[in-house]
């Protein structure tokens, strides 16, 4: 199965749609494993979420193939828990390969495990895991009926909302304000049920953290974990409560809880950021 096959026989039947879903042009399915490569993209700092988006899209496609669905009704793959870890501290090369696959834990849960490698040396650069809930179309519509919105969406807006760091008197605590997401920014996730993608909120949080740290070129993400507890609506201002602590001379830990202005919690992101100058 190639990228063309995936676009024709898988993507129309999963919850994510274009332009949100993002897969490379040279995918090969070999049994239950998936292989592809990417060139010329910047995954530094908050741009690591662009890689997460690609990996999550590949995981959804791989799980759909495993299900061998013949009903032609949409199946929704909702991320429960995400983990990515950097395993090499060499500079990320221009061309990387992605290999791995997905497996089913049950009819309602699945997992994707992928490695990002240096194409030339074969060295593993990142390990990635994503746990999914697998939901039928009818169940999705029932669970998320309050999100239904059939307003026609025009141009896809790739620019994410602005944010602001709010320092507190406590050295270990700060907050991040993130302006509301729009329909256009969340186009394709999911069709007629606009939900803010986890990778988008993570991008905004990381962007503000790197701005807070300053001198962005000396830092890199060592690991990132995310746990979603509730779907994030558009049109809502988010307040991110951040706890930070330097565990090692060159490693800073951040725990970020995403809430709305009423205090409702939606997700937690745990990030370890390493200073490149002291490795």
Predicted regions and their residues:
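Non-catalytic linker/capping segments at the edges of enzyme domains
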Residues: 1-46, 105-111, 117, 123, ...
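Extended aliphatic helical segments
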Residues: 18, 116, 196-199, 205, ...
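A conserved, well-ordered hydrophobic junction motif at loop->secondary-structure transitions
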Residues: 29-69, 171-220
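Hydrophobic beta-strand-centered segment that forms part of the acyl-chain substrate-binding groove
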Residues: 59-107, 126-129, 205-253, 268-270
């Amino acid at each position: 199965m190639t990228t063309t096959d995936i676009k024709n026989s898988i993507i129309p039947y999963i919850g994510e749609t274009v332009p949100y879903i993002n897969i490379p042009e040279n995918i090969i399915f070999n049994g239950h494993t998936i292989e592809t490569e990417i060139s010329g993209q910047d995954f530094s700092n908050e741009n690591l979420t662009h890689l997460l988006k690609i990996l999550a899209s590949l995981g959804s496609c791989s799980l759909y193939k495993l299900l061998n669905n013949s009903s032609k009704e949409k199946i929704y793959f909702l991320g429960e828990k995400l983990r990515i870890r950097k395993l090499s501290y060499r500079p990320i090369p221009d061309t990387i390969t992605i290999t791995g696959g997905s497996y089913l834990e049950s009819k309602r849960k699945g997992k994707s495990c992928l490695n990002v490698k240096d194409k030339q040396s074969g060295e593993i650069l990142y390990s990635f895991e994503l746990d999914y809930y697998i939901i039928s179309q009818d169940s999705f519509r029932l669970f998320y009926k309050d999100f239904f919105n059939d307003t026609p969406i025009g141009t896809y807006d790739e620019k994410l909302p602005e944010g602001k760091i709010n320092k507190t008197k406590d050295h270990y605590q700060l907050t991040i304000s993130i302006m509301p997401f729009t329909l256009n920014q969340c186009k394709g996730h999911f069709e007629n049920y606009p939900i803010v993608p986890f990778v988008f909120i993570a991008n905004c949080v990381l962007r503000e953290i790197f701005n807070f740290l300053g001198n962005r070129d000396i830092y890199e993400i060592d690991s990132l974990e995310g746990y979603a507890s509730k779907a994030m609506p558009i049109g809502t201002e988010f307040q991110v409560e951040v706890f930070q602590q330097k565990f090692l001379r060159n490693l800073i830990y951040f725990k970020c809880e995403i809430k709305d202005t009423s205090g409702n919690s939606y997700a937690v992101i745990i990030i370890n950021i390493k200073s490149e100058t002291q490795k």
